[in-house]
Curated annotation (Swiss-Prot):
Belongs to the frog skin active peptide (FSAP) family. Tryptophillin subfamily. The modification Pyrrolidone carboxylic acid is found at residue 1. This is Tryptophyllin-T3-2. It comes from the Eukaryota. It comes from Phasmahyla jandaia. It is found in: Secreted. The lineage of its organism: Eukaryota, Metazoa, Chordata, Craniata, Vertebrata. Signal peptide: none annotated.
Length: 13
């Protein structure tokens, strides 16, 4: 697990 999830889920529209 080398993927630090610090950014919130972004949904491009």
């Amino acid at each position: 697990q080398d993927k630090p999830f610090w950014s919130p889920p972004i949904y491009p529209h």
